[in-house]
């Protein structure tokens, strides 16, 4: 009799879990496209794109200016003229390389951040495909569709303070979901895109 009580409780628990909507929803596939996440920050990414473009132009113009004009003219009769010319050339080329590197880093960081920040996540009808929409440079947006089994959420929504990292198989770097965004269907998100998978 004592052994039958836990068995009855377990069977009751299993029947309750089977009656929940989400597992049945996932087994049969979703009948239509379901929005799982949305976060609109198009204006921010437009400003970020303009800032990065301005920084790229600024650092490139500094590099061109460093290459085009020598810092100082060395008189022809000056002693050690060849040493001073070398120092001036090394200084100019070093400054040009440094400025060019700064411009490339700022542009690359802005481009990477805008391409990896997620605007929306849509679970397509059938429940086997997911469409991720990211902010492209200047907030123009780009989207791609991947199978659900190729997406892994690296942390639960409650574990991270600001950004939720998503790993997509075959793509470098994580995709970032801002927790300030809207999760219209949290239970379905946690059971599909928000689940951890070893890729």
From Swiss-Prot:
Q: Which GO terms describe its molecular function?
A: mitochondrial ribosome binding
Asked if the keyword Transmembrane helix belongs to this entry, the reply reads yes
UniProt family annotation: Belongs to the TMEM223 family.
* Record note on quaternary structure: Associates with the mitochondrial ribosome.
**Mitochondrial matrix topological segments:** 1-43, 116-199
> Which residues are on the Mitochondrial intermembrane side of the membrane?
65-94
Membrane topology note: Multi-pass membrane protein
Entry keyword annotation includes Transmembrane helix: yes
Q: What is its main location?
A: mitochondrion
What PANTHER family does this protein map onto? TRANSMEMBRANE PROTEIN 223
Name of the protein: Transmembrane protein 223
- Provide a GO biological process annotation: mitochondrial cytochrome c oxidase assembly
Taxonomic classification: Eukaryota, Metazoa, Chordata, Craniata, Vertebrata
Looking at the record's lineage, which domain of life comes first?
Eukaryota
Gene transcribed to yield this protein: Tmem223
GO terms for CC?
mitochondrial inner membrane; mitochondrion
Transmembrane segments in this chain: where?
A: 44-64, 95-115
Q: Where in the cell is it found?
A: Mitochondrion inner membrane
């Amino acid at each position: 009799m004592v052994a039958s009580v836990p068995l009855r409780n377990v069977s009751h628990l299993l029947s309750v879990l089977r009656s929940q909507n989400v597992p049945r929803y996932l087994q049969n596939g979703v009948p239509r496209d379901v929005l799982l996440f949305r976060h609109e920050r198009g204006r921010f990414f437009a400003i970020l794109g303009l800032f990065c473009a301005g920084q790229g132009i600024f650092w490139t113009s500094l590099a061109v200016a460093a290459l085009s004009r020598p810092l100082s003219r060395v008189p022809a009769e000056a002693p050690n003229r060849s040493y001073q010319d070398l120092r001036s050339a090394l200084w100019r080329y070093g400054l040009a390389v440094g400025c060019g590197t700064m411009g490339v880093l700022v542009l690359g960081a802005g481009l990477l951040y805008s391409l990896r920040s997620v605007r929306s996540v849509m679970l397509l009808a059938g429940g086997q495909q997911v469409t991720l929409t990211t902010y492209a440079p200047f907030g123009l947006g780009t989207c791609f569709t991947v199978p659900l089994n190729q997406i892994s959420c690296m942390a639960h929504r409650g574990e991270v303070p600001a950004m939720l990292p998503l790993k997509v198989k075959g793509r470098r770097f994580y995709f970032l979901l801002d927790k300030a965004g809207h999760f219209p269907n949290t239970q379905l998100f946690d059971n599909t895109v928000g689940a951890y998978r070893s890729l």
